[in-house]
UniProtKB/Swiss-Prot annotation:
It is found in: Cell inner membrane. The lineage of its organism: Bacteria, Pseudomonadati, Pseudomonadota, Alphaproteobacteria, Hyphomicrobiales. It comes from the Bacteria. The keyword Transmembrane helix applies. One of its GO terms (molecular function) is ATP binding. This is Potassium-transporting ATPase KdpC subunit. Part of the high-affinity ATP-driven potassium transport (or Kdp) system, which catalyzes the hydrolysis of ATP coupled with the electrogenic transport of potassium into the cytoplasm. This subunit acts as a catalytic chaperone that increases the ATP-binding affinity of the ATP-hydrolyzing subunit KdpB by the formation of a transient KdpB/KdpC/ATP ternary complex. The chain crosses the membrane at residues 7-29. Belongs to the KdpC family. It is a single-pass membrane protein. Pfam families: KdpC (PF02669). GO terms for cellular component: plasma membrane. Its main location: membrane.
Amino acid sequence: MLKQLRPALVLLTALTAITGLAYPLAMTGLAGAIFPAKAAGSLIERDGTVIGSSLIGQNFTGAGYFHGRPSATTAPDPADASKTVPAPYNAANSSGSNLGPTSAALAERVKADVEALKSENPGAPVPVDLVTTSGSGLDPDISPEAAYFQVPRVAKARNIPQDKLRDLVTARIEGRTLGVLGEPRVNVLALNLAVDDLARR
């Protein structure tokens, strides 16, 4: 019996060592050598302090900042662990919304968001990504249209001319990946850091 089990045990041990140890360590080392910043999480530092990642959105709410997409992520309810409460951009619980197109709660939330955005910029069409959540709830980017839409509010709050903010948005538009994948986008954290820098001048 041991003679019959030995090949299976040897194969199990070998494959575990190769695929569970050697391969992951090799890929981690290779990624760290070729793409050190990306392998470390694409972290963004300011004055020696990590303030975020270019890959994970943050919940900007102040009038003087550009806002990202709505986030449907949640966290455990402190009062009842069997329930959850909204926790926008909670990276520990990445998820989209389970609300379908016939959901009254979703329709009410979108309607309220559209009305709030229209009050900020009357007469301009509301970009769809400012009222819809992403699949992960952690999307770090918005469309250029969503960024331009927010320029009047940010300009008023920061007392910065709108044309300067529009130029800032234009300078931070990232094109399609490999020229064909995805859509043009603006990283919200990078844009807000640039706004902070502009406001200091």
